[in-house]
């Protein structure tokens, strides 16, 4: 296959007016009597299969519950707890005070107030992160 044959094949495949031919359907003999017997067999088989998974479902549910219990026993992220302690510490008290005042102003003003407390929130988070970082590194070492 040459270079131009490959290019031509790509162009033929990409053109929207390319001819697409489907495969012919498989020839199946139409028999009425065996078809009714096979449907009876399949309904009996499906009923048996439907009852079997019902017995397996409680086992699967029990396994899922055990996995959920194992997930609950996982270690709590120390970063979250350290940041919470720092937010409530003396070091971040001014930032927390400003954020709490802003939150009270915004919630008390209702829908007319266009102020938000994003800046105060970021100051509080920054303070908590800066406070918690050295403590976190010490616990991870």
UniProtKB/Swiss-Prot annotation:
InterPro entries named in the record: Cyt_b-c1_6, Ubol_cytC_Rdtase_hinge_dom, Ubol_cytC_Rdtase_hinge_dom_sf
GO biological process: mitochondrial electron transport, ubiquinol to cytochrome c
Membrane disposition: Peripheral membrane protein
Cystines in this chain: 102-117
Keywords assigned by UniProt, alphabetized: Disulfide bond, Electron transport, Membrane, Mitochondrion, Mitochondrion inner membrane, Respiratory chain, Transport
Domain of life the protein comes from: Eukaryota
Recorded GO CC terms: mitochondrial inner membrane; respiratory chain complex III
Localization terms from the record: Mitochondrion inner membrane
Pfam families assigned: UCR_hinge
Region (Disordered): 18-94
Ranges of compositional bias, category Low complexity: 18-37
Location (main, coarse): mitochondrion
Compositional bias (Acidic residues): 56-75
Comp. bias intervals (Basic and acidic residues): 76-94
Keyword Manganese belongs to the record: no
Subunit structure: Component of the ubiquinol-cytochrome c oxidoreductase (cytochrome b-c1 complex, complex III, CIII), a multisubunit enzyme composed of 10 subunits. The complex is composed of 3 respiratory subunits cytochrome b (cob), cytochrome c1 (cyt-1) and Rieske protein (fes-1), 2 core protein subunits pep and ucr-1, and 5 low-molecular weight protein subunits qcr6, qcr7, qcr8, qcr9 and probably NCU16844/qcr10.
The protein's role, per its UniProt record: Component of the ubiquinol-cytochrome c oxidoreductase, a multisubunit transmembrane complex that is part of the mitochondrial electron transport chain which drives oxidative phosphorylation.
Family classification: Belongs to the UQCRH/QCR6 family.
Protein name: Cytochrome b-c1 complex subunit 6, mitochondrial
């Amino acid at each position: 296959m040459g270079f131009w044959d490959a290019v031509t094949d790509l162009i033929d495949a990409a053109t929207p007016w390319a001819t697409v031919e489907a495969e012919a359907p498989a020839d199946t003999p139409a028999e009425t009597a065996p078809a009714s017997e096979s449907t009876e067999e399949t309904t009996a088989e499906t009923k048996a299969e439907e009852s079997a998974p019902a017995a397996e479902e409680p086992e699967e549910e029990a396994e899922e519950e055990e996995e959920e219990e194992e997930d609950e026993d996982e270690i709590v992220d120390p970063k979250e707890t350290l940041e919470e302690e720092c937010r409530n510490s003396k070091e971040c008290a001014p930032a927390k005070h400003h954020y709490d005042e802003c939150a009270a102003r915004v919630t008390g003003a209702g829908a007319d107030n266009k102020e938000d407390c994003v800046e105060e929130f970021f100051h509080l988070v920054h303070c908590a992160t800066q406070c918690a970082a050295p403590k976190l590194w010490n616990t991870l070492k």
